[in-house]
Amino acid sequence: MAWQLTVPELQDQLQCPICLEVFKEPLMLQCGHSYCKNCLDSLSEHLDSELRCPVCRQSVDCSSSPPNVSLARVIDALRLPGDTEPTVCVHHRNPLSLFCEKDQEFICGLCGLLGSHQHHRVTPVSTVYSRMKEELAGRLSELKEQHRDVEEHIGKLVNNRTRIINESDVFSWVIRREFQELHHLVDEEKARCLEGVESHTRGLVASLDMQLEQAQGTQERLAQAERVLEQFGNESHHEFIRFHSITSRGEVQQARPLEGVFSPISFKPALHQADIKLTVWKRLFRKVLPAPESLKLDPATAHPLLELSKGNTVVHCGLLAQRRASQPERFDYSTCVLASKGFSWGRHYWEVVVGSKSDWRLGVIKGTASRKGKLSKSPEHGVWLIGLKEGRLYEAFGCPRLPLPVAGHPHRIGVYLHYEQGELTFFDADRPDDLRALYTFQADFQGKLYPILDTCWHERGSNSLPMVLPPPSAPGHLTRAQV
């Protein structure tokens, strides 16, 4: 025999129409409907007139309602072990089987029909329980999700904290190492300065010792001559006169010091006290620059008049154009050539030998800058240059161009690029230990930058001297980490 009802539907059929709970001590009325014994007793107590069945409205007699034994057995068979009995209404002694949604209170069936809750919205406790169970499950799911989010957030915070500590430890180590190297360099410069002072002092003292030795010899001869003269003064008249012209005159002449022998010496060191810090700073600055880059020129970018040699490290402007393929990266008007290596981050230093050229330009250019037609020499077009014009005017190519007060004629130009700080500085690099800044561009660099050399026109041979990328000098540099 197949069952037509599910367990929830069966529970609905076993509910008392008054308390809406599973029957407890069910009684069967004459009409055939069943009710809880307590529900019928409470209902009959509150009604003065005859009792009518709440379901079919048929007049019934509660006193002759027998227990519905079969229904009670079915309920007992379906009841789970350990099911707790509902609490009882203090007013009607009926089970608190309903829940008043307005007052948020548990009530019995009579409270909903006859009491203060009769016009309120009431719901069976089981329904409220199921609803709240679902709400609790939803809330629990939200809390678990929030808990997972918080755990994930805590994990990220812990990882972030660990990363910060690790990065701090690494950076602290770098600082200690850098300062250790700086202290070493300062100690070297200190020893160098002291050695210079001591060497200068030794020379001065040696000169004074020689003069002192000469003066002491003269002093001894004078004392000897003085003793001879005193001895002659005790001789007889004849003896004194006889030996006077022979002996004493020669002794006195020999002992007489030459005029102007003593020449005072002043302590004048090559390094003045007020210049110590500046001089040492210049020497240290040269050493803390990045190691010079080893650069080569890119033939694919060279103007047809340019001739490259010595492993693409030397370029000069010739009189005849070279046969070169027309490529997008090649300059077709300006006599320029790029280095094959570009920079998009970090600190870099390189040098260019310009010699005695009367006209030249050098600097950096964006890889995306146009190379066709006349080169637009300005930072607005991605070109940062300085140069020499007609052998007398140094200038920085900005907007507008800026004349540079350069002392002398540098034969070697140093270029220092700090990409992240947006700095491009040019130096007079003729004296390795005394770099002199010529000009600094400030810019927000974007994309890859390439060193650029512009030999300018050969001027019928008068400006045909080459520009050279010298090999980097190995010693004397402190290579600093990029941090």
Curated annotation (Swiss-Prot):
Stretches annotated zinc finger (B box-type): 84-125
GO biological process terms on file: innate immune response; regulation of establishment of protein localization
N6-acetyllysine modified-residue sites: K372
Compartmental location: Cytoplasm
Residue ranges occupied by any B30.2/SPRY domain in the UniProt entry: 275-474
One Pfam family per UniProt: PRY
Any Gene Ontology CC annotation: aggresome
Enzyme class (EC, first level): transferase
GO molecular function list: identical protein binding; ubiquitin protein ligase activity; zinc ion binding
Family: Belongs to the TRIM/RBCC family.
Assembly and interaction partners: Can form dimers and trimers. Interacts with several E2 ubiquitin-conjugating enzymes, including UBE2L6, UBE2E1, UBE2E3. No interaction with UBE2H. Interacts with BECN1. Interacts with SQSTM1. Interacts with NLRP3.
UniProt name for this protein: E3 ubiquitin-protein ligase TRIM50
Organism: Rattus norvegicus (Rat)
Lineage: Eukaryota, Metazoa, Chordata, Craniata, Vertebrata
Gene behind this protein: Trim50
